[in-house]
Amino acid sequence: AIHIVELDEDVNLINIYKAECNAKKTFKDRFPELMDNFARILVEEINIDTVDYAVIEEPIFAQNRNVVRTLSEVVGAVWGTLCLSDIPTTLVDNGTWKKQILGSGKATKDDIMKYAIEQWGDNFPEQDYADAACIALYSVKENRNGST
């Protein structure tokens, strides 16, 4: 799944989105559906003309190389889709955004969820939404500073 969080420049939570696909299929069989659903969200649910920039979390290093490959393929496809939509996009390492937003590059999932709920309320039905919200906050702060 691809989790998307939209914040405004005042870091108010606008909306959360999730592009999904049939997880019972092989990755190669479900990938087109996943990307189609991501593109549909961009076109039909988010007014992409109002999106100033986006940030994507870089693929994490996992012990299983198949997981790394799958994450890398999804990140590359999302990045390409955003670029083709003329949305300036950067990638950020998970340790970087965690350190900037939470004060520690090794922040836990519980730390992230607690921070997200304190910042935006209990609006995160899944951990990945809280992660995406903090990554979006990182992007807003970096753009204010002219870093991205």
Where are these regions (language model features)?
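Phosphate- and other anionic-substrate recognition elements at nucleic-acid/protein interfaces
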Residues: 1-148
